């Protein structure tokens, strides 16, 4: 795709193409009827990044055509949230005539929320000084006086200045219950807030009749762990990225959930620990006895590369497997192994990325009789 063509008239057509493609891809696995979860037709992305172009006294956002690499001016971006679109012109207008804020500015990143908070990161090809800090504080005050709930980060080489927080607090509604999530700049969060809510509701529905405990690999900031905790006695969740683990702990406390335990381990390390091949000090320090857990269900949301063979083999040891995938190609590869022992009993498409080829899929697998 050369440029993102956000055309609501085409939304249903592009969704139908994805439905057909996903059904064709997974037909060999005897999947049930596909459950389809639509996105808003525009203003669905909670984050966006733009390069900044300096032209005389003018200053504006640009993006690049992916095929020709030619730049084009962006004043509004229909894929991004209304909050980002509302802020874009006011931010650039406020910086245009301010030498300290605009000098060697080359990129602006926005992280917004359904809750109304927004975080702006300004990236520079120069070191930032006291003058920049004073001007950035004034910019923040000016924009918040106009009704925004905004924080600013200034970034340069080996430098990060935070005014006043480097995160936003998101609130996602799951079947009428609100969950609080800390989302930190530069760490992974679901890009499409409304579809993220639908994914959580689907996962909760799939595990409604569960017994025992839940094991979750690749838990990020606890996005799924918190919503799923209601369906299980206990949740044991693993994540390798330290900032995500810190956010997950924050989110557990903020939501007053007392049956979720987060461990900083990779999926591969957890496999070694559960099979008794290796001991981890982190488990002892956290006071976690893996043998005390009775996990019948495992939840995985791996990176685009999917799960390695050893992790797939370990996952096969559970009665029920819930798998969220941002790359159906690697989901297929993993199902070649998982379907030796399990049947797919639920199958879903989440349109996280409208007007692109990307598809987010979910499957529930249950052990063959």
Curated annotation (Swiss-Prot):
**EC number(s) recorded for this UniProt protein:** 2.1.1.-, 2.1.1.35
Q: Which residues form the active site?
A: 326, 360
- Record keywords, A-Z: Methyltransferase, S-adenosyl-L-methionine, Transferase, tRNA processing
Keyword presence, Transferase: yes
Write out the GO biological process terms: tRNA methylation
> Tell me, what is one Gene Ontology molecular-function annotation carried by this entry?
tRNA binding
Gene3D superfamilies, alphabetized: 2.40.50.1070, Vaccinia Virus protein VP39
Binding residues for S-adenosyl-L-methionine: 190, 218, 223, 239, 301
Does Chloroplast show up as a keyword for this record? no
- Database matches in PROSITE patterns: SAM_MT_RNA_M5U, TRMA_1, TRMA_2
Membrane-spanning parts? none
One GO location term (cellular component): cytosol
Q: Which reaction does it catalyse?
A: uridine(54) in tRNA + S-adenosyl-L-methionine = 5-methyluridine(54) in tRNA + S-adenosyl-L-homocysteine + H(+); uridine(341) in tmRNA + S-adenosyl-L-methionine = 5-methyluridine(341) in tmRNA + S-adenosyl-L-homocysteine + H(+)
- State its role: Dual-specificity methyltransferase that catalyzes the formation of 5-methyluridine at position 54 (m5U54) in all tRNAs, and that of position 341 (m5U341) in tmRNA (transfer-mRNA).
Question: Which HAMAP family does this one have?
Answer: RNA_methyltr_TrmA (MF_01011)
The UniProt similarity line reads: Belongs to the class I-like SAM-binding methyltransferase superfamily. RNA M5U methyltransferase family. TrmA subfamily.
Provide the protein name: tRNA/tmRNA (uracil-C(5))-methyltransferase
Species annotation:
Vibrio campbellii (strain ATCC BAA-1116)
């Amino acid at each position: 795709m050369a440029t993102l063509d956000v055309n609501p008239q085409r939304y249903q057509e592009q969704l139908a193409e994805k439905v057909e493609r996903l059904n064709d891809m997974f037909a060999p696995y005897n999947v049930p009827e596909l459950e389809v979860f639509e996105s808003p037709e525009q203003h669905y992305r909670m984050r966006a990044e733009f390069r900044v172009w300096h032209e005389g006294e003018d200053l504006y956002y640009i993006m690049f055509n992916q095929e020709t690499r030619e730049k084009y001016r962006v004043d509004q971006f229909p894929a991004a949230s209304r909050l980002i679109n509302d802020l874009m012109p006011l931010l650039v207008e406020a910086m245009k005539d301010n030498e300290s804020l605009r000098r060697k500015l080359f990129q602006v990143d926005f992280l917004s929320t359904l809750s109304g908070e927004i975080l702006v990161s300004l990236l520079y090809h120069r070191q930032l000084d006291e003058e920049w800090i004073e001007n950035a504080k004034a910019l923040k005050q000016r924009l918040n006086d106009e009704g925004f709930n905004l924080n600013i980060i200034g970034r340069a080489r080996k430098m990060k200045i935070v005014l006043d927080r480097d995160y936003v607090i998101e609130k996602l509604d799951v079947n009428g219950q609100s969950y609080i999530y800390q989302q930190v700049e530069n760490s992974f969060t679901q890009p499409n807030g409304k579809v993220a809510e639908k994914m959580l509701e689907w996962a909760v529905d799939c595990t409604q009749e569960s017994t025992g405990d839940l094991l979750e690999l690749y838990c990020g900031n606890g996005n799924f762990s918190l919503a799923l905790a209601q369906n299980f006695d206990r949740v044991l969740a693993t994540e390798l990225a330290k900032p995500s683990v810190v956010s997950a702990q924050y989110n557990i406390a903020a939501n007053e959930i007392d049956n979720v335990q987060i461990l900083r381990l990779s999926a591969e390390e957890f496999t070694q620990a559960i099979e008794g091949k290796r001991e981890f000090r982190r488990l002892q320090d956290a006071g976690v006895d893996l043998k005390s857990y009775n996990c019948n269900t495992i939840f995985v949301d791996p990176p685009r590369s999917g799960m390695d063979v050893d992790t797939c083999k370990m996952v096969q040891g559970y009665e029920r497997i819930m798998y969220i995938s941002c790359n159906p190609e690697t989901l297929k590869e993993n199902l070649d192994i998982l379907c030796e022992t399990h049947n797919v009993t639920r199958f879903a498409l989440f349109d996280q990325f409208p007007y692109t080829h990307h598809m987010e899929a979910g499957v529930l697998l249950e052990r063959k009789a």
